[in-house]
Structure formats: structure tokens, C-alpha cells
Amino acid sequence: MAGRSGDSDEELIKTVRIIKHLYQSNPPPKPEGTRQARRNRRRRWRERQRRIHSISAWLLSTCLGRSAEPVPLQLPPLERLTLDCSEDCGTSGTQGVGSPQILVESPAVLESGTKE
């Protein structure tokens, strides 16, 4: 893991294994029995899943000192984002990767469809 010490990696791996074990200890309910019995099993399973999720979040924040939720990425406004195909992008799916372009000006083609 880039930018972290080896001890932190070991703690992360240990914590992930614990969380994985928690989720594996709660398999989905069997689809048998009456409708009411299936509904009750699903309801109890969802409650256990919610508890496991909150325990996992607690483990990540307490043991590793980080949030369970990813840090939100600040993006520019959608009006400023456009696709620039003026360069030869290729069709293989691998060319042009790693050099995204953000243009400030929106092309007139896109603007004509947004006016009401």
C-alpha cells in the first residue's frame, strides 16, 4: 500500500479479515418454507447485515483511525466537463488512457439540446 508503513498494512489486513469473517458468518437465508417464514428470515438477515455493517465501520474508524466511507472527491461542475475527440483517441480501449481533458467551454452541440 503506497505511502503507508508496514505496520499499518498488517493492521489493515487483519481488520479486513475480521470484517470478511463477520460477513461470511451471516449467509443469505434459504428460500424455503412459507411466505411469512421467508419474510421473517430475510428481515432478521437484513438486521444482522446492518449490525455487521456498523461493526465494520466501527472497526475501521477505531482500529485504523480512518472513516469507513470514502472521502468525497471534489469534481468541477458538470457544465464544464466535455469530451474532446479532436485528437486521435484510437479504438482499442487502451490508447489515450491517463490523459483526461477538461474543457472550460461547452460545445454548441450540447448547449442546443439543453435549452427549453
Curated annotation (Swiss-Prot):
UniProt subcellular location: Host nucleus, Host nucleolus; Host cytoplasm
Location of region: Disordered: 20-48, 91-116
Stretches the record annotates as Homomultimerization: 18-26
Coiled coil residues, start to end: none
Motif (Nuclear export signal and binding to XPO1): 73-84
Positions occupied by motif Nuclear localization signal and RNA-binding (RRE): 34-50
Entry keyword set: AIDS, Host cytoplasm, Host nucleus, Host-virus interaction, Methylation, mRNA transport, Phosphoprotein, RNA-binding, Transport
Protein modification: Asymmetrically arginine dimethylated at one site by host PRMT6. Methylation impairs the RNA-binding activity and export of viral RNA from the nucleus to the cytoplasm. Phosphorylated by protein kinase CK2. Presence of, and maybe binding to the N-terminus of the regulatory beta subunit of CK2 is necessary for CK2-mediated Rev's phosphorylation.
Keyword Phosphoprotein: yes
Amino acid composition bias (Basic residues), ranges on this chain: 36-48
HAMAP family referenced in this protein's UniProt entry, alphabetically: REV_HIV1
Functional summary from the UniProt entry: Escorts unspliced or incompletely spliced viral pre-mRNAs (late transcripts) out of the nucleus of infected cells. These pre-mRNAs carry a recognition sequence called Rev responsive element (RRE) located in the env gene, that is not present in fully spliced viral mRNAs (early transcripts). This function is essential since most viral proteins are translated from unspliced or partially spliced pre-mRNAs which cannot exit the nucleus by the pathway used by fully processed cellular mRNAs. Rev itself is translated from a fully spliced mRNA that readily exits the nucleus.
Domain notes: The RNA-binding motif binds to the RRE, a 240 bp stem-and-loop structure present in incompletely spliced viral pre-mRNAs. This region also contains the NLS which mediates nuclear localization via KPNB1 binding and, when the N-terminal sequence is present, nucleolar targeting. These overlapping functions prevent Rev bound to RRE from undesirable return to the nucleus. When Rev binds the RRE, the NLS becomes masked while the NES remains accessible. The leucine-rich NES mediates binding to human XPO1.
Annotated protein name in UniProt: Protein Rev
Organism: Human immunodeficiency virus type 1 group M subtype B (isolate CDC-451)
Gene that encodes it: rev
